[in-house]
Amino acid sequence: MAKEKIRIRLKAYDHR
């Protein structure tokens, strides 16, 4: 599922 990929992307994006 892409949900897991989105979660990882969100986590990396939240690493501002």
Swiss-Prot record:
Transmembrane segments: none annotated. GO terms for cellular component: ribonucleoprotein complex; ribosome. Signal peptide: none annotated. Disulfide bonds: none annotated. Keywords: Ribonucleoprotein, Ribosomal protein. It comes from the Bacteria. The keyword Ribosomal protein applies. Belongs to the universal ribosomal protein uS10 family. Part of the 30S ribosomal subunit. Involved in the binding of tRNA to the ribosomes. This is Small ribosomal subunit protein uS10. It comes from Geobacillus stearothermophilus. The gene is rpsJ.
